[in-house]
Amino acid sequence: MSPRHPGWDALAETLARDARVTRMHRLVGGGSADAYDVTLDRAPGRVVVKVFRDGDDTAPLEWTRLKFAQRVTMPVPEPIAADLESTWFGRPAIVMSRLTGRPDVAPKAVDSWIGSLARALTELHETALDGAEGALTRPPLAETWRPPAGQHDSLTSRAVDAVTAHLPSLTSEHVFTHGDFNPSNVLWHRGRISGVVDWSAARLDTRWSELAYCRDAVCFLLGPEIADRLADAYSDIVGYTSDELAVYDLMSVSSRHYAAASFEADRQLGHTPDYEVSLAHLDEQLRRALKRLDW
């Protein structure tokens, strides 16, 4: 989006009378939208603007999810304004507060990093659920999971068979989940988590599906041993574990087909793991999950 687009003036005027945009730059990532760090010459000052792409109708869903996430005890962007009618840029846009910090996808103090992620997940999963409806109650992963398309190698076939066999026995206990909780969406400042961003996929789902999703990202970055330490740290905090984690770990088999996108996102954040090694890490995580299920 060009800085000269008249939509920026309309946005600024919506946020504060006679306000002007004095500075802006596009942020790394953004997922299904283009995200910008924008500075105004008056309050609210520095904000993040997310402009959704043509044909993307998820802006109202994300706005609802972000507003619900305000009850989370960890720092979350504050919703400021929404243009769901596409009057600013010809596309839907939402404005939120900017949090301090940046992602850490190559931690030096791994033990502290893992412990902080586990505590953040636990804190998130303790969020009160009263009033959750609409976008937050869409079908959980256990109801929407499908095996990856195309021909499967032997490891993928075993994983798919194991998931298919265990799906009917998965519990229906739901907590509030971020939906995309991974290191690239966790901000750090001075060695501590300073916020969690991108609540576009937030919904009610099981804690084990979210933990498995995060483990998958950690495994891709740092290997299965570190991913296992995250599971241990989380289970130590909540006081129990479940074989369902292994089932959800196996559901992540499809992530191998999107590893190139994950690799590019990590590269933009300043970390460039060995792509083939990262794929081998994901395969090893699948083998460990199959072993835990005696499959």
What are these regions (language model features)?
Residues P3-D18, T87, E123-G179, D236, ...:
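An alpha-helical support segment within catalytic cores of ATP-dependent transferases
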Residues R17-H25:
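Conserved N-terminal boundary motif of the eukaryotic protein kinase catalytic domain
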Residues H25-A135:
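ATP-binding pocket architecture of kinase catalytic cores
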Residues P44, R91, S172-H174, R192:
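Conserved catalytic motifs of the protein kinase core domain
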Residues V48-V51, I80-A81, F176-H178, V197, ...:
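Short beta-strand segments
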Residues D56, Y213-W295:
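Helix-rich C-terminal or lid/interface subdomains of diverse kinases
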